[in-house]
Amino acid sequence: MKIILADSAGFCFGVKRATNLAFDAAEQFEHICSLGPIIHSPQVVKKLEEKGIKVIRKVEDIDHGAVIIRSHGITAEELDIIHDRELKIVDATCPFVKKAQDYATMLCNEGYSVVLVGEKDHPEVQGIISYTRGGEVFVVADCKEAQRLPNRPKLGIVAQTTQSFKNLQQIADICLGKSKEVRIFNTICDATSVRQNEARKIACEADLMLVVGGFNSANTTRLAQICQEIQPRTFHVETVEQIQDGWFEGVECVGITAGASTPRWIIDQVVERVSDMSK
């Protein structure tokens, strides 16, 4: 059985940076926590907890020590509280996420209504909205929602960093019919685009696709959706234990990709498991 492993599988720059900062901070500070999970990988979060980094869900529950700002960023209101309490900050926000925050803020300051392409309940999206400080922001997940947008004199478009370029492009096309003036900032992470394009190519060749990563990871879920559109025999797994032998009946070529927050050791376990089945 042939195995095609995506070159782009695993940690992206932002996740690698965030985890390195977190492990270094664990050595530096006696009392340290992260506001929400640093990345969307339960396995990595568990390893960080073993190093003494507790995940705290509410900023109000942090009254001393150091706090790590997760890779997805936090809200402006949460950051205000952290500053007010004079907590030490380890900022692990992905630079691409910060760029999306800055563009959304700039657009609102210049009088644009912002169309944010993304998932309304995702922490990254909630963070981006908050930095506009009450500006008009419409969160749209797909073309259907974009069709319902009201007309506005000026529209500015930004995207959650893990969105597909195709989705951004289609929504932008609809927005062109909603306003006389439209500004578009492609805030999709470069690594996301590379990963998605590579997944498409592999899915065209493979008889079965395995997409490895946290079930709570937006970019991994999107990878699975992209692969599923091309290769219906696509399975999203978080760990090697979830792989079932019955999936591989009649399969000659297996494609494997992984989300941006999937550690290498989990990918290696999946590759080893599939290799063992072909012996």
From Swiss-Prot:
Keyword Cell inner membrane part of the UniProt annotation: no
Keywords: 4Fe-4S, Iron, Iron-sulfur, Isoprene biosynthesis, Metal-binding, Oxidoreductase
Binding residues annotated for (2E)-4-hydroxy-3-methylbut-2-enyl diphosphate, in chain numbering: 40, 72, 122, 161, 217, 219, 261
Gene3D superfamilies assigned: 3.40.50.11270, 4-hydroxy-3-methylbut-2-enyl diphosphate reductase, catalytic domain
The record's free-text note on cofactor binding: Binds 1 [4Fe-4S] cluster per subunit.
Sites where the protein binds dimethylallyl diphosphate: 40, 72, 122, 217, 219, 261
CC cofactor: [4Fe-4S] cluster
Any matching Pfam family: LYTB
Catalytic reactions of this protein: isopentenyl diphosphate + 2 oxidized [2Fe-2S]-[ferredoxin] + H2O = (2E)-4-hydroxy-3-methylbut-2-enyl diphosphate + 2 reduced [2Fe-2S]-[ferredoxin] + 2 H(+); dimethylallyl diphosphate + 2 oxidized [2Fe-2S]-[ferredoxin] + H2O = (2E)-4-hydroxy-3-methylbut-2-enyl diphosphate + 2 reduced [2Fe-2S]-[ferredoxin] + 2 H(+)
Pathway connected to this protein: Isoprenoid biosynthesis; dimethylallyl diphosphate biosynthesis; dimethylallyl diphosphate from (2E)-4-hydroxy-3-methylbutenyl diphosphate: step 1/1; Isoprenoid biosynthesis; isopentenyl diphosphate biosynthesis via DXP pathway; isopentenyl diphosphate from 1-deoxy-D-xylulose 5-phosphate: step 6/6
Broadest EC class assigned to this enzyme: oxidoreductase
Single GO MF annotation: metal ion binding
Record-annotated membrane-spanning stretches: none
Active-site feature positions: 124 (proton donor)
List of residues binding [4Fe-4S] cluster: 12, 94, 189
Gene Ontology biological process terms, A to Z: dimethylallyl diphosphate biosynthetic process; isopentenyl diphosphate biosynthetic process, methylerythritol 4-phosphate pathway; terpenoid biosynthetic process
Family: Belongs to the IspH family.
NCBIfam families for this protein: ispH_lytB, PRK01045.1-1
Protein task: Catalyzes the conversion of 1-hydroxy-2-methyl-2-(E)-butenyl 4-diphosphate (HMBPP) into a mixture of isopentenyl diphosphate (IPP) and dimethylallyl diphosphate (DMAPP). Acts in the terminal step of the DOXP/MEP pathway for isoprenoid precursor biosynthesis.
Identification of the protein by name: 4-hydroxy-3-methylbut-2-enyl diphosphate reductase
